[in-house]
Amino acid sequence: MKKNILTTLVAALVYFLCIGVGVLLGNLVDHTGNMFYAPAFSALVGGSVYMILLAKVPRFGAITSIGLVIALFFLGSKHGAGAFLPGIICGLVADGIGHLGHYKDKVKNLLSFLVFAFGTTGPILLMWLTPQAYIATLIARGKSQDYIDRIMVAPNPANILLFITSVLIGALLGALIGQALSKKLAHKTS
């Protein structure tokens, strides 16, 4: 039990670092400063951590814990009321999907990660669902009007489709890489 908790905490820390790498990669693709591509790149980079955690700790709660860490980050970093909700909701739902397959079913684990990847979308969703509140949060954090104008992404159908598609592609690739790496690590230890 103690080993599972430690493994989960380490995975949460490493996944959090993957989110940071995802933000950096997103900024390389889009120089506006918004986080539009960060969830997709975070999923691409974090898929391996997720799949290895499922192999090492095949119990309900591990994935929920990482979702909670993501949620607490968004809550603590003042991204706006509600930005933390996707982390909690996606973490719980993803954990439930993985649990249905006893964390051994490749397809359910893949679906689980596709859902989990949307846990980092809170700030973008808030920008689209409550733009005035999102702008007020940015102003309260000391952001200039120029910055705000640059990072706001209109919630038109093309942008929404691009956002969802990019997250799904990043998550799919991240999960497949993660499953291959997890399998390789399992063969090395046996």
Model-derived features: positions:
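Membrane topogenic helices and adjacent juxtamembrane segments
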Residues: M1-N27, A136-Y147, M152-A158, K183, ...
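Hydrophobic transmembrane alpha-helices
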Residues: M1-S65
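Hydrophobic alpha-helical transmembrane segments
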Residues: I5-V10, A40-F41, I63-L68, F84-L85, ...
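Aromatic-anchored segments of alpha-helical transmembrane domains
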Residues: Y15-V21, V69-S77, F116-L125
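Membrane-interfacial segments
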Residues: G22-D30, V57, G61, I97, ...
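Interfacial aromatic-anchored transmembrane helix boundaries in multi-pass membrane proteins
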Residues: V23-H31, M35, I70-G98
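Membrane-embedded alpha-helical hairpins and interfacial helices in multi-pass inner-membrane proteins
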Residues: M35, S112-K184
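Short helix-perturbing small/polar motifs within transmembrane alpha-helices
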Residues: G87-L125, A175
